[in-house]
A protein has these predicted regions:
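Extended polybasic, low-complexity segments that bind anionic RNA or targeting/receptor surfaces
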Residues: 3-150
Length: 150
């Protein structure tokens, strides 16, 4: 007999709450000085040695960036296979596309390294826009209804 694994513990979180959690986490990291903006992290070939050299260069300015566990999450503007493979062999760093950024991965790491800030802002504004959440027109409809009643 024993325990059965048929229970599903998955919880659905609506889009507005996910966006709010991402915004709160981003703002907290920024206020704590744990967001690092880098011009580019593009790599021509998947080389862990190059990725390690980049992290060591960044680590001179930020203590704890080269620690042994959960030091940084690198958010790339787009999925670059060479860059992702280069950082995949490093145990203390996670890398992923900015479009896939979530609060859990940001909270697991001490620092958030964002490559190409201009593209990052565009990607985040698309991800966090109110139109994507289906929210903005609510005020306009309420105003029209109120005007129609008068």
């Amino acid at each position: 007999h024993g325990p059965r694994s048929d229970k599903n513990y998955e919880v659905k979180i609506n889009r507005a709450m996910r966006q709010k959690a991402l915004l709160v986490t981003l703002s907290r990291k920024y206020k704590d000085g744990e967001v690092i903006f880098v011009d580019s992290l593009e790599m021509a070939a998947p080389k862990t040695a190059t990725a390690k050299a980049m992290m060591l260069a960044l680590g001179k300015s930020f203590s704890g960036l080269n620690k042994s566990k959960n030091a940084a999450y690198i958010a790339l503007p787009s999925r670059n296979a060479h860059t992702l493979k280069s950082f995949a062999n490093m145990g203390h760093v996670q890398a992923g596309a900015l479009a896939d950024l979530n609060p859990v991965s940001m909270l697991e790491a001490k620092y958030l390294v964002i490559a190409d800030p201009k593209a990052a802002i565009e990607t985040l504004s698309k991800k966090l826009s109110t139109k994507a959440a289906g929210g903005a027109p609510a005020k306009a409809t309420v105003t029209k209804k109120a005007a129609a009643k008068k």
